[in-house]
Amino acid sequence: MKKIALVSAIALASITAAHAAPTVYGKVLLTGEYTDVDDKTATNKDTSTTQLVSNSSRIGFKGEDDLTDTTKLVYQLEYGIDVDAASNQDSKGKDKNQFYSRNTYIGLAHNTMGTLLAGRHDTPFKLAKGGVDVFNDYDNVGLGNLMVGETRANNVIAYRSPTLVGVPVTFMAAAVLSEEDKDADVANTDIDEGANGYSASLAYDQNGVYLAAGYDNNIRSSKTDSAWRLAGSVDMGKINMVPGFTLGALYQETDVADKSEDEKSWLVSGKYKIGATPWAVKAQYIDTSNRSGVKDNDATEVALGAEYTINKATKGHLYAAQIDTDNVSDKTIVGGGLEYKF
C-alpha cells in the first residue's frame, strides 16, 4: 500500500492542471558508519560492524490551493527512503517498507486563524526541540537515542497558530486518536489504551533567540503517561557576541508508563561556522537518568562532528560519538558521508 501511495503521489506531481503544481523536494544523506560495541550484559558479546546508513533520507510532495481569499488547502506527502537497503526483507529477500510515511497530511490554512492539519505528523512536544539537537540528522547519534518522546504519530489532528498578536510566539496542539475501543484497557498497565493522546507546545523565535516548552500526555507509541521539555538556543552572532556560534540546551522529564521512576534528561550543544570557510564544527553532550523509567539505568552521549559545504545543495559530514549505557553497553560510532538536498 505504501508503494502504491508513493506511485500515486508521483503521478500527481506529473499532471498539468489549472491548480498549482506540487513542489517536489527531498534529500539523501548517506554515510558509512563503523560501530564498536562493548557489551556489559550477561551474554558479554562484543561486536564491531561497518554499514551504510540512510539517515532519514526522504522524498516529498507539498502544495496549496486557494479556496477563498483567506483560506487555502494545504497538503504534504513525505516518504522516508532507505537508500542503502530495504527497511525489512521477507524470507525471499524481497524489499518490504522501502518507502515509509513521514509527515503526511492534508489541512486548511487561514490567513489570521492558523492552520488545521490531519494525518501523520510529529507531535508538538517533539517539534519543541527546534534546532537544539545538532546531531538530529543522523539515525544512530543524537537525542532520539537516549530520550523517549521523539514521536511521529498516526491519526493526528493538529492546530498551529499564526504569530500571536504581533509577538513572535506560536502555539501548537494535537490530539492523537487512539484507534481503540474507548473502553479498552489492558489489565495491570498504566496505559489507557482507549483514550486519545494529547500534545502541545509554545515557542518564541526572534533575532536568533529560540525558547520553547512542550508537553505530552498518554502518547502510547512512546509509552509515556506524561512528559515535558524546555528547549532553547541562541545564535551568538545575532546578539553581537560570537559570529557563527550557536549554543543550545534542553531539559526533559518523562513519566514512563508502568515504571516507578521518572526519566530525566538534559542536553547541551554548540555549533560553530568557521568564518568565511566552508567548514562548520559541532559538539553535543546528553545525560539521561533512569532511562526508560528503570532506576539507576543511566546513559550518556558525547558527540563531535564537522560539516563541509560544497555548494547550496551538497554537504559533507564527519562525526564520532561515544554512547555509554549502564549495565548494557559502551558504544563507539564513527561515520562520514554526503548529503544532497533538492
Region annotations inferred by a language model:
Residues M1-F342:
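Outer-membrane beta-barrel proteins
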